[in-house]
Amino acid sequence: MHRRITGKLVIATHNPGKLAEMRELLAPYGIEAISAGELGLAEPDETGDSFQANARIKAEAAAKAAQLPAFADDSGLAVDALDGAPGIYSARWAGDAKDFAGAMARIERLLQERGATAPERRTAHFVSALCVAWPDGHIEEVEARADGTLVWPPRGTAGFGYDPVFLPEGHSRTFGEMTSIEKHGLPPLGLGLSHRAKAFVKLAEICLAG
């Protein structure tokens, strides 16, 4: 049986960009959100073999440490011409320095080496797996994706991570060129384009709506 989120919620991330997006999505529901970083919680090793497994690891670790419900996201970019890479290793490609400019350049170099210059050879998708875990072991999980193509050079300074090279399907601007309202579906535009917004809508239906 599904469980509703009430009271305080730990956002199990130390990523400032991801934290801002998750707080933005939670804001309309009046949830008091505190981050794992603010609580001084350690980051668990992400040893899962899927986005969902890693989201669960992060949420369960934070819930156990804080003795509060915890909300985690594991997300990444999967490039078709690179056999789904960087995938669950999207953050690791940027290294400890969070050098996403370097990671984007690495992807572009690999695409060029494979002759992937035409848009139809540059398809990719973002995946977001969300998990809410409670201290008693109950979990709720959802996953969603956003399809698109990769552009070069990067465009826009909004968002974070690989947003400046990701052109969502049916649009002429990258995620890096969109406002958070456009990307995440904040009022008044409704459901947004992003993988995280789509996954959050699924989660809200079972844990927050009503």
Curated annotation (Swiss-Prot):
Enzyme class: hydrolase
Presence of keyword Cell inner membrane: no
Cofactor(s), names only, from the UniProt record: Mg(2+)
Organism superkingdom: Bacteria
Catalytic reactions of this protein: XTP + H2O = XMP + diphosphate + H(+); dITP + H2O = dIMP + diphosphate + H(+); ITP + H2O = IMP + diphosphate + H(+)
One Pfam entry name: Ham1p_like
Binding site residues for Mg(2+): 45, 74
Cofactor note as given: Binds 1 Mg(2+) ion per subunit.
Hydrolase listed as a keyword: yes
EC number: 3.6.1.66
One GO location term (cellular component): cytosol
Matches recorded under Gene3D superfamilies: 3.90.950.10
Residues annotated as the enzyme's active site: 74
Membership in a protein family: Belongs to the HAM1 NTPase family.
NCBIfam families, alphabetized: RdgB/HAM1 family non-canonical purine NTP pyrophosphatase
Function field: Pyrophosphatase that catalyzes the hydrolysis of nucleoside triphosphates to their monophosphate derivatives, with a high preference for the non-canonical purine nucleotides XTP (xanthosine triphosphate), dITP (deoxyinosine triphosphate) and ITP. Seems to function as a house-cleaning enzyme that removes non-canonical purine nucleotides from the nucleotide pool, thus preventing their incorporation into DNA/RNA and avoiding chromosomal lesions.
PANTHER family assigned to the protein according to its UniProt record, in alphabetical order: INOSINE TRIPHOSPHATE PYROPHOSPHATASE, INOSINE TRIPHOSPHATE PYROPHOSPHATASE/HAM1 PROTEIN
This protein's name: dITP/XTP pyrophosphatase
UniProt source species: Rhodopseudomonas palustris (strain ATCC BAA-98 / CGA009)
